[in-house]
Amino acid sequence: MTTITRWVLATVAILVLAIPAGAGEPSQDIVGFAAHHEFSGVITKIESGMLFIHTDYGLQPRTVSPNKADRVGLHNAQVGETINLLVDSGNVLIDAASTDRAFPDHRFVAGTVRYADPYWQEIQLSTPEGTSTFEVDALAGNKLSVLPEGAPVTLELDAANVMIDVHRGR
């Protein structure tokens, strides 16, 4: 065997072993369970009920809509107040809270998709307890478009029982 042939065989063997078998296949996960990041920010402006939040460490400024502010208990927020923010792996804001409230009031519901509203308003799940319908947060709605009926999912719900995130599989 020549030196070039050995070199080619060794290179091919390394490439075959280095590339995982499913590298070309898309992931089944929409968002991993541990992919949430919590940080705080300061409200710099409130305009027409919209909260504008400045965050440290060069992170992009955030906004909280009037509907979300009411739902998460920030309807009496003031400029200069520090609040906690929770984002998913796609850097999308999924929850906000005053600093005296943490995020452990989230709950998870597992089931199969029975119906996902094309306008992202609600999702229906078949669970062992029966069919359940949940309102969908406006920022989480785009995740519904990739969920076919019958797909096994786990929904993450906030304290108001609104879907804020979805995870494929159970």
Regions found by a protein language model. Give the residues of each.
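Short, flexible, surface-exposed loop segments at domain boundaries
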Residues: 2-8, 12-15, 19-63, 67-131, ...
